[in-house]
Amino acid sequence: MKLSLIRSMTRSAVFELENGLCYRPAHPFTVQLNGETVYTACETNVFSLFSLLPGTPYTVAVQAEGETLTLDFTTEAETFFVDASRYGLVADGTTDNTGKLQAALSTCPKGGTVYVPAGRYRTSSLFMKSCTTLYLEKGAVLLGDNDRTHYPILPGVIPSENEVDEYYLTGWEGNPLDSFAGLLNITQVHDVVVTGEGTLDCDAQNGDWWINQKVKRIAWRPRAVAAVDSENVCLHGITVQNSYSWTIHPIFVKHLDLLSFNINNPYNAPNTDGIDPESCEYIRIIGANIHVGDDCIAMKASKVFLGMKLKKSCAHTVIRNCLLDKGHGGIVIGSEMSGGVKDMVVTQCLMDHTDRGLRVKTRRGRGNTAVIDGLVFRNVEMRGVKAPFVINMFYFCDPDGHSPYVQCRDAMPVDEYTPKLGSLTMEDIVATDAQFAGCYFDGLPEQPIERVSMKNVTITFDPNAEAGQAAMADNRPNVKKLAIYAENVKEIDLHNVKITGYEGERLRFANVGHFEED
């Protein structure tokens, strides 16, 4: 067992107890800072310290499982401390504070921190600037405006003078379409930190954001946090809730840290995914606690227009020690992934009653740049996940999702619009109380899934399981207690894969190439 520092900021820091367990330790542990007890019973492997002083050395000590682990660290330096209350904030939850909060953010000197004290501050869109920190104190709530006309509209595409180049400022479900600016926007900046124990509350349930959500009204819905074309961005500690649509949506961001924070959206709030990195690189999602009504974490890379034009994949991602609760999918790839998704490692995550666990969704039309490869899922626990492992290359999304082109089960020509799935590795995973299917792998006949490798995987079905759709595709029957279904897969390797409580044949294969099991 080891204690490690994930990241230190000016007034906060986040740590990880390296115990090999999924999200939670075997027993609660105590945390001390410079000899003073901070937590008497910490129940997560990742924990944070707040209200620290900048440029100050500290010693943190953890007492866990009979061991005492200590670690010295120093907070980052800070140039200036900007108390946003001095800008005339009114913390009554009603008064519009947008201009005052933006003034504090815009005038903060380089290397400074904007501090928002406890209180409820109604606001619309805010924009961060480079080399600054936003610190939300415990009890501070930035409360989203309920009137959509108060939000700026961001153009999806900005043309250049040469009428050839284009700049993509925002997007909606993988296309560069005009959208409202988010509650918090991190656009064309670098070295930005948002931290603290406060809350971004979009308050979408009290507006019209979730009504007729598929209809564009003025512009497409905003995100809670929208980051575009930025570098070295960190979100830490805060709670983000009641989002208008996707909660945290970074596009073209390099070096992104999402650490030890909470996302809470109602189970029936439409399209309120937790985290949707789109064509981002070098991502760390560690210690997230996500409760949503759609996908918890969905890795994306645009639809075919941007994907094939820019060829920007979502790559080099680490997801660790996260709780993924009640969503449609725990860890999801796609379906907007025309730029490709590569080199992702998921470890020590706990999925609790999501519809699907590890889920890949794509379809014809995403393009030959839509390559998914190098995905590793290791040391993951699933509880009550209806379909733990799903790969679906017939996903029925978009207006043409039910068309013969997308749903035809016969082989079609491999062309520039055919996606590809490479290697997926799943190891040391326990799934209990599954319902629909343990493994459901459905590749394209003309472009089969390259390789699926499973090692030390245990799946147990709920005795009272109900039938349902393992994958969202046409002409697929509802299934119940289906062990392993695979169609159009070049290679499947199963090593110490144990499935109990299933019905019918254990293996239901069609057009599977090399198969190995021990």
List each model region and its residues:
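Extracellular/periplasmic carbohydrate-active domains that bind, remodel
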Residues: 1-518
